[in-house]
Curated annotation (Swiss-Prot):
Its main location: cytoplasm. This is Proteasome subunit beta type-3. CDD domains: proteasome_beta_type_3. One of its GO terms (biological process) is proteasome-mediated ubiquitin-dependent protein catabolic process. The modification N-acetylserine is found at residue 2. Non-catalytic component of the 20S core proteasome complex involved in the proteolytic degradation of most intracellular proteins. This complex plays numerous essential roles within the cell by associating with different regulatory particles. Associated with two 19S regulatory particles, forms the 26S proteasome and thus participates in the ATP-dependent degradation of ubiquitinated proteins. It comes from Mus musculus (Mouse). GO terms for molecular function: endopeptidase activity.
Length: 205
C-alpha cells in the first residue's frame, strides 16, 4: 500500500469566471479505520488564497505550519499580501528542499491575485513540481474518479453559483467511489468581494 493512501483524502480546485473554488473531504482515518470526520485539509494563505493538502496527515499539518511560518516572514518583509504564483514557488521550494525524504503530500493552490483579481489554480507533486491549468486540478486517493467527474462536468466561464454546484457534484460523486475518503465535503468559493464556505453532507460509511 502506498504511503500516500495511508490516511486517505481528496482535494480539488476549479476555475470559473472571475472566481475559483477549492474543495476537500473531511475524513481522517488510518487505512480502513475511521478516526475523525472534521479533519482540516484546506488552509487560508491570504484574503483570497487557499492551499489544500492531500496525503499523509502528519505531513499535511507539518507543511501547513511551515508554510504559514514562511508566509508570515514574507508578509513582514514585503509588507504586502502574497500573490498566488509566488505562493506556488514558495511551496515548490519547501517541498524540493526535502526531495530525498519528501513530505508525503500533494498540494493544490487556489486563489485570486490581490491586485488584478485574476483566478489562479495549480497543483504540485510531492517533490514540488508545479502544474498550472485553466480548468481544474485534483489531488488525493481518488484522483482518477475526480478527473472523470471534472472532465464530464467542468465548463469554461462558470459563475460562482454554477462553479459551486459543479465542484460539489464532482467531489461528492468522486469520494463515494473511494473507501478511504469522504465523510462530508467542505467547499470554499473565492470571489473578488467575498468568500463563501459551505459544508456538504455525504455518505457516512
Amino acid at each position: 500500500m502506498s504511503i500516500m493512501s495511508y490516511n486517505g483524502g481528496a482535494v480539488m480546485a476549479m476555475k470559473g469566471k472571475n472566481c475559483v473554488a477549492i474543495a476537500a473531504d473531511r475524513r481522517f482515518g488510518i487505512q480502513a479505520q475511521m478516526v475523525t470526520t472534521d479533519f482540516q485539509k484546506i488552509f487560508p494563505m491570504g484574503d483570497r488564497l487557499y492551499i489544500g493538502l492531500a496525503g499523509l496527515a502528519t505531513d499535511v499539518q507539518t507543511v501547513a505550519q511551515r508554510l504559514k511560518f514562511r508566509l508570515n516572514l514574507y508578509e513582514l518583509k514585503e509588507g504586502r499580501q502574497i500573490k498566488p504564483y509566488t505562493l506556488m514557488s514558495m511551496v515548490a521550494n519547501l517541498l524540493y528542499e526535502k526531495r530525498f525524504g519528501p513530505y508525503y503530500t500533494e498540494p493544490v493552490i487556489a486563489g485570486l491575485d490581490p491586485k488584478t483579481f485574476k483566478p489562479f489554480i495549480c497543483s504540485l507533486d510531492l517533490i514540488g513540481c508545479p502544474m498550472v491549468t485553466d480548468d481544474f486540478v485534483v489531488s488525493g486517493t481518488c484522483s482518477e474518479q475526480m478527473y472523470g467527474m471534472c472532465e464530464s462536468l467542468w465548463e469554461p466561464n462558470m459563475d460562482p453559483e454554477h462553479l459551486f454546484e459543479t465542484i460539489s457534484q464532482a467531489m461528492l460523486n468522486a469520494v463515494d467511489r473511494d473507501a478511504v475518503s469522504g465523510m462530508g465535503v467542505i467547499v470554499h468559493v473565492i470571489e473578488k468581494d467575498k468568500i463563501t464556505t459551505r459544508t456538504l453532507k455525504a455518505r457516512m460509511d
